[in-house]
Amino acid sequence: MLDGSPLARWLAAAFGLTLLLAALRPSAAYFGLTGSEPLTILPLTLEPEAAAQAHYKACDRLKLERKQRRMCRRDPGVAETLVEAVSMSALECQFQFRFERWNCTLEGRYRASLLKRGFKETAFLYAISSAGLTHALAKACSAGRMERCTCDEAPDLENREAWQWGGCGDNLKYSSKFVKEFLGRRSSKDLRARVDFHNNLVGVKVIKAGVETTCKCHGVSGSCTVRTCWRQLAPFHEVGKHLKHKYETALKVGSTTNEAAGEAGAISPPRGRASGAGGSDPLPRTPELVHLDDSPSFCLAGRFSPGTAGRRCHREKNCESICCGRGHNTQSRVVTRPCQCQVRWCCYVECRQCTQREEVYTCKG
């Protein structure tokens, strides 16, 4: 994908990108971008089959761990929602990192190597995956695509004289409970497992923090005698921006050897850490992303990324950073694009074709 493309271009790509989620070991439940199996292209909509069997086969195609497969089979709408969640997560990850050296490369061998280490990038993958699943499930409930959940009734919010609860809110209560059970928790003695689980929860908490109450007025002549209100999730792009900020301020915890950075040593617990037995728990109470290892530079091709040689960059914005001081090539090309578009009655858009010359910058090898 081209760096610097508008968000709309990334969202349009969703029609052709649907990724397979996977689970790993019996002791752990992993999801989407954090699975070790290859991300495989699947149809977003299920093929027409006998209604009673279609979602069973879809869940089997996802190659889930036993518990996850059982949860998938409970509701005919889960399989399609899981696939949608992975697609959302992948697209948002690539959009948020489009100007970075690591541009959320999800090719199998790079992703597999990355997930074996506790980098900041790994933390982001866990958080964006759990956030994507939480968001997609809550929306699927309110859209009527699930059998075991419907709209959010918000029983914890007080009805007031001036307004009443109504509409169809996104069911965050159901989705967050489902996600925590779906992802599971590994042994608390395993620091890496606890770090991964912590980052999963950060994704869920960011979704919760973005919930807003939306209201619609009812009354004579535009008055607001009665308001109908419901809870609505923030657009997933806003969630992605929030998680990207958390990635940039991620906290390093624990004690580990950094093969990627060539360093080793004990790390002091971060601010706001939880007090475990003997005060030894390094994980923070606050919803911050945490990591164990220093990230590699991602400048050169290696185990964790294909490097930045040949990457497109923006001369005034990020060429110096992305190209790692190697400089960049400049290529001039002529492009033709629709321009001066007008809507004609009825009902089509008429555009002229405008030709212009533009310069493309790519990193030197």
Swiss-Prot record:
GO terms for biological process: canonical Wnt signaling pathway; cell fate commitment; cellular response to retinoic acid; cornea development in camera-type eye; embryonic skeletal joint development; iris morphogenesis; negative regulation of cell population proliferation; negative regulation of chondrocyte differentiation. InterPro entries: Wnt (IPR005817), Wnt9a (IPR013303), Wnt_C (IPR043158), Wnt_CS (IPR018161). GO terms for cellular component: extracellular region; extracellular space. A lipid is attached at S221 (O-palmitoleoyl serine). GO terms for molecular function: cytokine activity; frizzled binding; receptor ligand activity. Ligand for members of the frizzled family of seven transmembrane receptors. Functions in the canonical Wnt/beta-catenin signaling pathway. Required for normal timing of IHH expression during embryonic bone development, normal chondrocyte maturation and for normal bone mineralization during embryonic bone development. Plays a redundant role in maintaining joint integrity. Glycans are attached at N103. Residues 1-29 form the signal peptide. This is Protein Wnt-9a. Belongs to the Wnt family. Forms a soluble 1:1 complex with AFM; this prevents oligomerization and is required for prolonged biological activity. The complex with AFM may represent the physiological form in body fluids.
